[in-house]
Amino acid sequence: MLLKELSAVASPLNDQQIDQLQQAAAESSPQQLAWISGYFWGLSQTQASTHLQSVSQPGVVAAAQPAGKLTIIYASQTGNAKGVAIALKEEATAAGIAVELVSAGDYKGKNFAKETHVILIASTHGEGEAPDDAIDLHEFLQSKKAPKLPNLQYAVIGLGDSSYEFFCQTAKDFDSYLSKLGAQPMLERLDCDVDYDAPAAEWRVKALAKAKETLSTGDADVVPLPITQSQQAVSQYSKQNPYEATLLTSQKITGRHSGKDVRHIEIDLEGSGLTYQAGDALGVWYENDPELALAIVAKVGLSGEELIDVDGEHIQLVTALVSQYEITSANPQLVTKFAALSESKKLEKLVADKNKLREYSGNTQIIDVLAEKKTQLSAEQLISLLRRLTPRLYSISSSQEEVGEEVHLTVGVVEFEKGEESRQGGASSFLSHRLEEGAAVKVFVEENNNFKLPADDNTPVIMIGPGTGIAPFRAFVQERDNREAEGKNWLFFGDRTFTDDFLYQVEWQKYLKSGVVQQLDVAFSRDQVEKVYVQHRVLEHAEQVWQWLQEGAHVYVCGDMNHMAKDVHDALLTVIEQQGKQSREQAEQYLNELRKSKRYQKDVY
């Protein structure tokens, strides 16, 4: 029943409470409504009565004092898993469950033997790797030291991207390890795709229901109840509640003969109170190209004027495609679904081969998938193929110590030709082509605690970032410069040509001249017959790299995950082998120890 109808019917709520709920609903996104639903479900399970106080005062509810404890462990690389874990903790507390929230990096594996109920929330990093904070726990649970866990009930939820081969691999690993140790699953593992908010909220409700079946509760106690988004919005912006910032600058920083269009983006955060650290990312909520939306509906025989239901509202199909759905990048699920709808022999053959399906999906835009076989679809069928729109995360390329209430990005514009037609990336073309300077753009800061400068300013730093992977290192050097850090800085940068692709060249030369950067080594792959990349420069300076490592240097790598990061990793192993006189196995262990101690950090994509 709609909230606006409540006052007209018999209801346990008074008019003031109805007004509060109406306000909360009106100011909340679909994801926030899903969270609120789970939160109020938890309250309904308590034995104590609840009382909603005025929104202008801190709200409290009576919640049952539990007997027994639920431990929530999160393994998070960029913060998404942590966010889900925090929401679950709040819902569990409201439901009267004693709960402990802990990072996988702070959790001792041997403590599993003392637990009765555990929920583990895990993201996956790189190629099926556990997040940095979870490496030790991940290794412990598959080791001979792991205890048998016959008295443990557990649940696992994974966050990932189904476009990648090792989708939610860390969550799958934890699920498998706990099961082999004799623990009993409370419910089936959920593997969430990029649009995880709603399914994760539903799963949390089910998980808490299962936990409460065997976690008893006692007398009521008072716990805080933050009931509206607007109460939190005063001091904090987030993915669900982004800040409406202003685009100050979108400047092309590659030369006229470059095959790339890379933009330096400056965004005004004045008055927002938003803060960030070097290494964090900026989430950008973007809109799709209206022309692309119209082309897609035409491709499947629709006009775009059809009305569809989106979160309880009826809106035109083309409007939904512009603002609510991902319509640029294909994914394996979309290709699989369209293969079934279109009965395309080509797509059916691709679907039968997972590797070819993943390769095709990663290199093909949605409109080109739809063009594989002319197929009439209904508006509902088209929508069923699509993911919900999610924000694009960009590594921040500025330090607030340097730029104040601004945030800078370094954005590579995705643009290529498909036959006689042009194809563009959704977010990059929005920032570079469709958003005018002075226009509003919704943003939020995504913390990345796994890509941070060393706390000790005397520590040497080695930064390896070709192409737009240079972004966080611009922030790092600005930060170290403003802090007058004594530690040495060494930058490896690479791209196609010196003349047209040396991003921020003047700035690096200034830092080199002033002594902020002690060493700058570049690799321009197309300036000579033989291709040279950053990993080659690392090997050329193997002796010095090893010396810096012996001095305690931290190593950072940012950029392409599929090729560059692997090649740099192999180069570092070779340096350790040759200069440290170690076997390959010992070199791998050495590098793994660097990663565990936060001396080897990667921000790859």
Swiss-Prot record:
GO biological process terms on file: cysteine biosynthetic process; hydrogen sulfide biosynthetic process; sulfate assimilation
Protein name, entry field: Sulfite reductase [NADPH] flavoprotein alpha-component
Gene Ontology terms: cellular component: cytosol
Cofactor note: Binds 1 FAD per subunit. Binds 1 FMN per subunit.
Domain Flavodoxin-like positions: 70-208
Binding site for FAD: 328, 362, 392-395, 410-412, 425-428, 605
Pathway in which the depicted protein is active: Sulfur metabolism; hydrogen sulfide biosynthesis; hydrogen sulfide from sulfite (NADPH route): step 1/1
UniProt key word Zinc: no
Gene3D superfamilies the UniProt entry points to: 3.40.50.360, NADPH-cytochrome p450 Reductase, Chain A, domain 3, Nucleotide-binding domain of ferredoxin-NADP reductase (FNR) module, Translation factors
Residue span, FAD-binding FR-type domain: 240-454
Cofactor(s) for this UniProt protein: FAD; FMN
